[in-house]
Amino acid sequence: MSTFQESRRERHQRLKQRRRRKWTAALAMGAAALLFSAGILLHAMDGPRQDQGEQAAAAPYGAPPTLGKARGNGAMGPLPPVYGPTAGANAAADGPIRLVFAGDALMDWSVKETIRKQGPDYPFAHVAEEIQEADFAVVNLETAVTFHNQKDTNQLFNFKSDPISLEGLKNAGFDLVSIANNHTLDFKQKGFLDTLANLEHYELPFMGGGKNGEEAYRAHEVTIKGKRIKFLAFSRFIPQTYWFAADDRPGIAEAYNKSSVLPVIRKESQDCDYLFVYMHWGVEKNNKPEPWQRTYAREMIDAGADGIVGSHVHVLQGFEWYNGKPIAYSIGNFLFPNYVKGKNADTGLLTLTIEDDGIRMSFSPYQIYRDQIIKKDAAYVKRQFKYLESISYDVAIGADRAIEAIQSKPPASGKH
């Protein structure tokens, strides 16, 4: 007897179509209600009709319809329903588990305008298929998601994205976002709480931040193909200490103090099969990690992490293996406005594949171009692999995109 099994990509397409039908139905019902109300109002009016000289500004593409009053947390509602997580939708009872990680996603500036014109799926049109082929996918949300306007004036740049941009991340195939970075509080606690509310609305789980310290340092756990897998996120680049999550304060999980990180890893790793850490760290534009980062990564693995993935520096950095565990020091920008050029525009998807005999690491190069993540030709991919090998630590990248550990070369004779 044959058994039909819906793939993760097919499920994403089906849910996206269902969301669109819900939006259309909700807007149609709203329009009908407005017409009905307008008819009653016109019947009831005794005085002259109001002059229509004032025109309301057109709402940006995807702005949530005002079908109700704004909630106290700043998110608009009620909104059309969004359907739930897709993790493991194509998972059999056994077999390899493919985890995909992407770098910093910023849907402000030119990306915001492009989404308003082209829709939230446009930036991910060329990369979504690979994301959806994974069993679980993670991205760093490098922006507040809010309509709140009061900036944190201590920031050089303040980023905020429209809530509809989260639909693009969801439709692309992401199952989890890290909010542990130096931009999710760009519009203060109000904007941060809006961000959490909007993520909850789009049913995009988050890690690395929260309404209090307990939530910020909590691991996100999923079960895929019978394996319990946890994810943690921390930031070691936070503009102000008042961004740190505390018992009674919303904020970010900080990594300046190892005592904030290593005990959490030890605790969370006790009752799961695998634990992965997403770190926001490093010196911007540097193509290699600082020595302290290499030490820190090893300490996190010694504490119980099964892999470390980094972001923040806006460029790709190299890879390393430590005790059979993968380290990717920076996977770069993932989606950034169209001012990014050269190495700032080089991006890709990191895949960690869990197999019976260990974890495999591979990387698929892409490029940011005019507010999209695009595929490149074989020559570009070959150049990227050669470059990434040159800045990595004792790895070789094969034609199959696998990143393998190689034995260090012994020192030359007579030198120590």
Language model regions located:
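Acidic, metal/ion-coordinating pockets
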Residues: S2-K16, R21-H416
